[in-house]
Curated annotation (Swiss-Prot):
Transmembrane segments: none annotated. Pfam families: Glycos_transf_2. GO terms for biological process: cell wall organization; regulation of cell shape; teichoic acid biosynthetic process. CDD domains: Glyco_tranf_GTA_type. The gene is tagX. Keywords: Cell shape, Cell wall biogenesis/degradation, Glycosyltransferase, Teichoic acid biosynthesis, Transferase. This is Putative glycosyltransferase TagX. Signal peptide: none annotated. It is an enzyme of class 2 (transferase). Belongs to the glycosyltransferase 2 family. The keyword DNA repair does not apply. GO terms for molecular function: glycosyltransferase activity. Its EC number is 2.4.-.-.
């Protein structure tokens, strides 16, 4: 078979060499490095590796997003002879392919003409040891499924560890989205796939340092607006309630609430802007399926991490919760209860030590 591997890059000098030298396969393959405008040593490093290793091509774009770079790679697949690619992968530039594992995917793909996707497990680097990502724990054995049979696939909104039939090169990432550009393309591919082969082995390891898209107020606003938009779009694409619940759980719990925790740890003072953004998100949840516990977890994040509450901001928060059927006490009683909860939490933490 013939495999095309797309790697979108931009200022990845710390990891790109490790990734490129980790890619090995018995199959005929080519690597397309699509650079979005690196200003560090990423491009010189790729050019040096082109002289050392076969199969590497470099395409340079200017001021291009990750989505634009991936789309350029997909266009290259469509523009070349159909026999040049039977399948493709997109690999994050901060990842590596674990030794001997790439051909686990290619072997599964060749095994059955109905296989349109092969999905392996992803790993993360924990003190130098590769650990299975919790979202991939449902892949317990090698088997063939569909999205209808395995809705847990919707918790894996990442290209890493996935091999696609070349026919899906007609799909595109959303260039208007900075963080969730791949959600729709992945869902469409899963929905269109005749069969999906799951491989219960860790294929790709992620070396990425956790960089949050919510470090300041403007970034946080853009990020929340984006995930509300993609959540609505994808929920409208999913026909089965179980699929919608699994996808919304991933977005509400991991993308929204985890980012909210990080933002409020950095900016604990409760502001009108913060409450309004959380209100907008909570209200958007009411128009689709969601896991009720996630709503309470979001509320707990705001109340427990927030500081410097005043009467006006609390009343906005209280009225928001009343609109979704959740009662809250008066301002003074809330402050007393909150103080007690925080004291109990600190005491419990001290006892654990």
């Amino acid at each position: 078979m013939r495999l095309t591997i797309i790697i979108p890059t931009c200022n990845n000098e710390a990891t790109i060499r490790q990734l490129l030298i980790s890619i090995e396969s018995k199959e005929h393959y080519r690597i397309l490095c699509i650079d979005g405008g690196s200003t560090d040593q990423t491009i010189p490093m790729i050019e040096r590796l082109q002289r050392e290793l076969k199969h590497i091509s470099l395409i340079q774009l200017q001021n291009a997003s990750i989505a634009t770079c991936i789309n350029k790679g997909l266009m290259e697949i469509k523009m070349t002879d159909p026999h040049d690619s039977d399948a493709f992968m997109v690999i994050n530039p901060t990842s590596i392919v674990l030794p001997g594992k790439l051909d686990r995917l290619t072997a599964a793909f060749k095994n059955n003409d109905n296989i349109d996707m092969v999905i392996g497990q992803r790993a993360y680097n924990y003190h130098g040891e590769w650990k299975l990502k919790s979202a991939d724990e449902f892949i317990k054995d090698n088997r063939i499924v569909t999205l209808t049979e395995q809705p847990d696939l919707l918790s894996m909104m990442s290209f890493d560890g996935k091999l696609f039939s070349a026919k899906f090169a007609e799909l595109q990432c959303d260039v208007t989205l900075a963080n969730t550009y791949n959600h729709e393309i992945l869902v469409k591919a899963m929905q269109k796939a005749t069969d999906i082969h799951l491989v219960s082995q860790m294929i790709v390891g992620d070396n990425d340092i956790d960089t949050h898209a919510t470090s300041n107020n403007e970034d946080f606003k853009r990020y929340i607006t984006e995930i509300m938009k993609i959540r609505q779009r994808v929920m409208e694409m999913l026909l089965l309630p179980e699929q919608r619940l699994l996808y919304s759980d991933m977005v509400d719990r991991i993308l929204f609430n985890n980012s909210l925790k990080y933002y409020m740890n950095e900016h604990p003072a409760v502001t009108h802007t913060t409450i309004q953004l959380v209100k907008d998100y909570i209200m958007s949840m009411q128009h689709s399926d969601y896991v009720s516990q996630n709503m309470f977890d979001i509320i707990n994040t705001v109340e427990f991490n927030g500081e410097n509450w005043d009467r006006e901001i609390y009343e906005l928060w209280r009225q928001t919760l009343i609109q979704v059927g959740i009662n809250r006490p008066t301002y003074k009683r809330f402050l007393i209860q909150l103080k007690g909860r925080k004291f109990a939490h600190r005491t419990k933490s001290m006892l654990k030590r």
